[in-house]
Structure formats: C-alpha cells, structure tokens
Amino acid sequence: ASNDPLIRQRLADAWIGLKVMRVNALRMLEHQGADLNREALISKLYWSNWHRDLGKLAMDILGNEAELIESAPYELTRMQKWYLFARADTIYAGSNQIQRNIIGERGLGLPKEPR
C-alpha cells in the first residue's frame, strides 16, 4: 500500500483532517462559555465523515484481507468492526443530511427546507 500514490495521498489527507479537528477542538476550548453551537455542529459533521473515510481507507489498504474473517463461526477483525461502526457515525446524533440542514438553518440563517 505504501507504494500506491493514491493510498499515500489518502493517508496524508487523513493526517491533515486529524490536525484540522485538533485545531478546531483547541479553538473551541479556548472560547469556552461562548455560543459554539455552529462550530459543534460542523465538528460533528466533519468528524463523522473523516472517521467513515478513515475506515474505508483501512479496508482499502487491507485489500482482499478486509473480507476475511478471523475464526469460525464469524468473528470480525478489529478493523472490520471499526469500518462498520464508522458507517454509523454518519447516522447517529443526526444523519449528515440532517446536520447539513441544521447548520444551514441555525448556523447560517438560511430558510428552512420545505417539509
């Protein structure tokens, strides 16, 4: 995988995304007590997408081994569990679509989406 330029680029993107989340978390800590609702909503959306993409990257690095099970009857590997759990990150605490609507309506003051 380290010889694949696309995998290397995705690893770099994941590292950068992690650094972005760290800086944003530190910035939010610095402004404790302030109204950070918009930032919190954006952070949740960013994190859930980052985590999902990182799980997909892990599966792509494993290649065909990502589809193998460890033992009978059916035991997922740690990476397989992580990948499947990361998919849920985009759903619980509000799906990404709902998060985008909330960011637009509450954070940016856009008109409500017709229901």
Question: What spans do the regions from the language model cover?
Answer:
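Alpha-helical interface subdomain recognition
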Residues: A1-R115
